[in-house]
Amino acid sequence: MRRSGEDVFGGAGLSGIEVQYVEELFDGANRVGVGGHEFLPATADAAGVASLEGVPHQLLLADAETAKDVLTFLGRATRISDEGVRLQAARGVLALTGAALAPHGLFDQTPTVLAMRVVQVDPELECDVVVSSLTATDDDSALTLPETGLSPAWAGVAPPRGHWQPTSTLAASVIARRAQWGISAVARGATPGSGEEAVRALRAAIWGEPDEDLGGLPRGVAFAADAFGFISGEEDVPVMQSGRWTRLAFRRGHVLARGPVAAGLTAVRGTGSAQ
């Protein structure tokens, strides 16, 4: 049985078929099925809410620790935004994706930065839904889905299925330091009485800015790694690229950022600038 903390996107503890499935996950949301039978929830309303009536309402996970892992990821995601977590499952693998940062509206310059973690699930479960909550049950290894799902815009922006090319590595300590710098900058800039739009613009400016210490990636990748608990001790984090997307493969999960194609990413030194 795979431990829930292992690196699965890179292949640790998974068969070749499972790895291939994980890299083909990003294709369509709001589908749920069991045993090969697919169910389609109702179309989302104007508020982005989709009914899950008539679909299986339980996730059967590998064990109690995996269920706790899923709830922890969801809890971290809900502290960041109210746009839920995407659950994509098939072939015994469940990928959880949350948006650390995502634009709201045409002129919002916030980058799309996603966090992903993968765990084992009931091999017969097939699903692709976005939910804002999951509920523990009498079975420690099972979680109950809510009655309704969500349809956030970020869930329709799919990372590529494959062709990830290694470009560099980043020291986890540097990523952590840049995250703390950004958090402090947001706190300093958000004056009392700042409106929602002003705070959003401030966050977009700070987290969306390319950071030299992160190889030119938006500083938001550091925020995502910190907020979702992916940084743990010393680690050289592989950086991979596919088209407009960049992926940071931590041992605890993955951060994916969408933006202009970055050329010439190089390994970053172990010390960061104070800025």
Give the ranges of each region predicted by the language model.
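Actinobacteria-biased recognition of intrinsically disordered, low-complexity terminal regions
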Residues: M1-L60, E65-K68, L256-Q275
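Long, compositionally biased intrinsically disordered terminal regions
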Residues: R3, F9, V131-Q275
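Residue-level detector of functional hotspots within protein domains
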Residues: G5, G11, L71-F73, I80-D82, ...
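A sequence-level detector of short, solvent-exposed, charge-rich linear segments
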Residues: E38-A44, A89-V93, A115, T169, ...
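Short amphipathic beta-strand/extended segments with alternating polar/hydrophobic composition
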Residues: G13-I17, T97-A99, G105-R117, V255-A263
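A broadly used, surface-exposed interaction patch
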Residues: G105-A142
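N-terminal ordered "arm"
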Residues: A50-P111
